[in-house]
């Protein structure tokens, strides 16, 4: 996999903003919030295999939101399958909640609003 983004060499006060831009560039238009944006760390590695994109992501605790405004831009129409290697991921979509922890995957639709709670 090729590293396409890292906060490592970015000034601490600018890391979270840069991370949000990277999410929008490499995934989907979203909003995100961090409890500690001045001490944010993350990286994104990516491989493209035909129509499938595989990525490895390390991210600090945060909440990610995709709403109707983002979807109206329809930058991508796809599904995401996430397999956390540590921590947990809570996905809220269509009135349902799914929790993913190491060893358990979660699937969600990018064409519908969602809220992801990413916890280390």
Residue ranges and their predicted role:
Residues 1-53:
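A short, N-terminal "cap"/entry segment at the start of jelly-roll beta-barrel domains
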Residues 40-120:
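N-terminal regulatory/effector-sensing and dimerization cores
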């Amino acid at each position: 996999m090729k590293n396409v983004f890292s906060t490592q060499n970015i000034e601490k006060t600018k890391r979270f903003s840069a991370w949000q831009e990277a999410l929008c560039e490499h995934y989907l238009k979203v909003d995100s919030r961090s409890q500690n944006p001045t001490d944010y760390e993350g990286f994104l590695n990516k491989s493209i295999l035909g129509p499938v994109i595989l990525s490895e992501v390390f991210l600090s605790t945060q909440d990610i939101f995709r709403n109707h405004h983002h979807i109206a831009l329809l930058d991508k129409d796809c599904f995401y399958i996430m397999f956390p290697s540590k921590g947990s991921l809570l996905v809220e979509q269509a009135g349902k909640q799914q929790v993913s922890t190491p060893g358990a995957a979660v699937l969600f639709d990018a064409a519908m609003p969602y809220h992801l709670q990413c916890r280390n």
